[in-house]
């Protein structure tokens, strides 16, 4: 396969991983194969039950924060996606035992800049709005976890935020979700409100 086709095949897998785990650029770039973890509570995901992040955002003067991001059922399509990349695409780069998940055609680790470039190319190909950037995938991930009704603390931990207020800034829930929430709360406050009066 020509090198440009390998690059084109790698980019979608990498971009989808940003969304499926809500990672920052640096976190994704720093991933090694050893960072893919099993989750004993979700054995069906095999080695993709969780991702161990070693290069999380640090506070001033502190080392990078580490955390584990669990694969959630709503995003479990990433399991087959990563399996395909690791078994079919990555070996074609001839990287041997290089530890990085995301590798270049010259057997090095991909850069943050290359992630931006791949996202820009995908955005233009899909005719998406110009103002979108790669970090928007992280915002979408956090919003979707909220809409999937995960607890706030779980979402905060998945995102690697030190404060719940930071996570709240990332969340932009849909009107449909807000309507469902009001419907649920009204049902709790006024039992039988949604029953058909006969």
What are these regions (language model features)?
Residues 30-81:
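Conserved tyrosine-mediated DNA breakage-rejoining catalytic core shared by Y-recombinases
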Residues 108, 116-157, 161-164:
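Short, basic (Lys/Arg/His-rich) helix/loop patches that form interaction surfaces
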Residues 59-83, 97-120:
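C-terminal catalytic core of Y-nucleophile DNA break-rejoin enzymes
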Residues 159-185:
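Catalytic-site neighborhood detector that most strongly recognizes the C-terminal catalytic loop/helix
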């Amino acid at each position: 396969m020509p090198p440009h086709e390998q690059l084109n095949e790698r980019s979608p897998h990498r971009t989808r991983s940003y969304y499926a785990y809500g990672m920052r650029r640096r976190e994704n770039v720093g991933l090694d194969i050893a960072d893919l973890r099993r989750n004993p509570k979700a054995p069906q995901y095999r080695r993709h039950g969780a991702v161990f992040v070693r290069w999380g955002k640090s506070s001033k003067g502190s080392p990078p924060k580490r955390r584990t991001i669990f694969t959630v059922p709503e995003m479990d399509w990433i399991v087959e996606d990563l399996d395909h990349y690791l078994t079919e695409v990555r070996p074609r780069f001839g990287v041997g035992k290089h530890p990085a998940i995301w590798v270049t055609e010259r057997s090095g680790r991909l850069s943050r800049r290359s992630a931006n470039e791949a996202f820009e190319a995908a955005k233009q190909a899909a005719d998406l709005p110009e103002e979108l950037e790669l970090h928007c995938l992280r915002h979408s991930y956090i919003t979707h976890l909220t809409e999937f009704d995960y607890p706030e603390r779980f979402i905060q931990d998945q995102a690697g935020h030190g404060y719940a207020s930071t996570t709240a800034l990332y969340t932009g829930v849909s009107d449909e979700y807000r309507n469902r929430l009001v419907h649920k709360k009204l049902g709790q406050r006024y039992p039988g409100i949604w029953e058909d009066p006969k």
